[in-house]
Curated annotation (Swiss-Prot):
Provenance organism: Prochlorococcus marinus (strain NATL2A)
Region span, Domain II: 68-146
Keywords for the protein's UniProt record, in alphabetical order: Cytoplasm, DNA damage, DNA recombination, DNA repair, DNA-binding
Keyword set includes DNA-binding: yes
Stretches for region Domain I: 1-67
GO biological process, one term: DNA repair
GO CC term, one of those recorded: Holliday junction resolvase complex
Name under which the protein is recorded: Holliday junction branch migration complex subunit RuvA
Family: Belongs to the RuvA family.
């Protein structure tokens, strides 16, 4: 059973709504499905370290990769629920960050869970019944999710800035240019952190597009 892989990216792929990478690990190519929100990072990084969940079937083996181990472990809990397959599990982790999803399940927020494509009211309620008392380990390192909300938001904002940095770096901009230009985002860190925390994956992508356009416009003005 494969649990973790580190290797060089040789290809990114897309099949319908599924996206992923092929990693060269010791001369062997592993095809791994990723969360779509991780694909932007996949486009600019050459080396990956991924936590893996492996599913073996008669027609082949499927690998699901995650940047963070708690994403992989929560994915395993989700697909242990009767009627929920790996694609719905991936969709849920695409829609929500781990703390948000754990919080929704523990607080019986079935309406929030149904925001995920493929999750109806009945499946959402089944998730809550089967998992709400099994997720304590995801919050053991924190007093409660609510008490650490500010830390979670700050961490999300930091990751968001890192992604923007990588994209700008891949476009040829240097460190000093990037650090100066992203001040238009960091100057409103609190506001943008709250916005990120309450946004869906699609809304986050739209926000990133908006910020990138603003930054590129600022960089263009400086070069003229």
């Amino acid at each position: 059973m494969i649990s973790w892989l580190k290797g060089e990216k040789v290809h990114t792929w897309k099949i319908s709504s599924r996206k992923g990478v092929v990693l060269n690990v010791g001369g062997v190519g592993y095809e791994i499905q990723l969360l779509p929100k991780q694909i932007d990072k996949a486009e600019v990084l050459n080396e990956f370290e991924l936590w893996i969940h492996q599913i073996d079937r008669e027609d082949g083996t499927s690998l699901y990769g995650f940047i963070e181990v708690n994403q992989r472990d929560l994915f395993r809990e989700i697909i242990s629920v009767n009627g929920i397959g790996p694609q719905i599990g991936m969709a849920m982790l695409e829609e929500f960050e781990v703390p948000q999803l754990v919080n929704a399940i523990e607080n019986k927020e079935s309406n929030l869970l149904t925001k995920t494509q493929g999750i109806g009211k009945r499946i959402a309620e089944r998730l809550i019944v089967e998992l709400r008392n099994k997720l304590q380990r995801f919050t053991d390192n924190d007093k409660t999710i609510h008490e650490n909300k500010n830390d979670i938001e700050a961490n999300q904002f930091s990751k968001y800035i890192d992604e923007i940095y990588l994209i700008l770096n891949s476009l040829g901009y240097v460190d000093n240019e990037i650090k100066e230009s992203i001040k238009i985002i960091t100057i409103n860190e609190k506001e943008n952190s709250l916005l990120l925390n309450s946004s869906s994956a699609e809304e986050k992508a739209d926000l990133m597009d908006k910020h990138l356009k603003e930054i590129l416009m600022k960089l263009s003005e400086k070069s003229t």
